[in-house]
Amino acid sequence: NHGFFSFEVKAPVFVARHLVKHEYLIMSEYSRRYITDDVEFYTPDVWRKAAADVKQGSSDEGVEGYESIFDFEDISGDVYSNNQDCVDLYNHMVNSGVAPEQARMVLPQSLMTSWTWSGTLGAFANMCKLRLSKDTQYETRLVAQGVYTELKKQFPIAAPLLVEGVL
């Protein structure tokens, strides 16, 4: 339970905000205030339908007509255009002298962000226990699966027992 881990994670902002809520895990995000790398956005491979049985969440079923990120005639093209418009506005603001810490407010939630995430085996196991469930957003579940894979490599007996709630 006292094993310590640090992970370098890259995910969309909306996933980072979902995961930052976990107790006893320290997240140090790389800020656009100090980083001038090109921005990168997340676009899903499939636009999922809203789940019929919960207020939030999605089903495993794709929305007809929106299956491909390359279907620029439909919603994916609109998302791509919106992201580009936001980047153009961000760059214009920075090039006009606006501080990057303020200009970044125009960037969308699909912006990819990176962070160092540190905590104990117990804290990460608790996060995995909650975020590996079927009702967790798919993109968040992917991060939890990556963390769980690493936990099992280091603690092949304890990690599954902690995640399953046996320990």
What is each model feature region?
Residues N1-L167:
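Family-specific signature for flavin-dependent thymidylate synthase
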